[in-house]
Curated annotation (Swiss-Prot):
EC assignment: 7.1.1.-
Compartmental location: Cellular thylakoid membrane
Catalyzed reaction equations: a plastoquinone + NADH + (n+1) H(+)(in) = a plastoquinol + NAD(+) + n H(+)(out); a plastoquinone + NADPH + (n+1) H(+)(in) = a plastoquinol + NADP(+) + n H(+)(out)
Protein name: NAD(P)H-quinone oxidoreductase subunit L
Organism: Prochlorococcus marinus (strain MIT 9312)
Length: 77
C-alpha cells in the first residue's frame, strides 16, 4: 500500500511539473520572444511563432490581462 502512495505522489509531482511548464514557463518565454522580435521576424519565424501560439494558447490566455504587447507610439500628439 505504501508503494501505491509513493507512485501516486511521483505521478502527481510529474503532472504538476508538466502543467507548470505548459501553462507558465513556455507562455512567458513566448511572450518575451514575441515582444522583442515582432518587427524583425522573417516569415518562417512568424509562422513558427503562430504555431506555438496555437499550441500554448491556454497559458497565453492566463497572462493576457497582465501583459501588454501593443505598439509603442512615437510620443507625438
Amino acid at each position: 500500500m505504501e508503494s501505491f502512495f509513493n507512485n501516486s505522489f511521483a505521478t502527481l509531482i510529474a503532472y504538476m511539473g508538466v502543467i507548470t511548464i505548459y501553462l507558465l514557463v513556455i507562455p512567458l518565454l513566448l511572450f518575451y520572444w514575441m515582444n522583442n522580435r515582432w518587427h524583425v521576424m522573417g516569415k518562417y519565424e512568424r509562422l513558427g511563432i503562430y504555431g506555438l501560439v496555437f499550441l500554448f494558447f491556454p497559458g497565453l490566455i492566463l497572462f493576457s490581462p497582465f501583459l501588454n504587447l501593443r505598439l509603442k507610439g512615437s510620443g507625438k500628439g
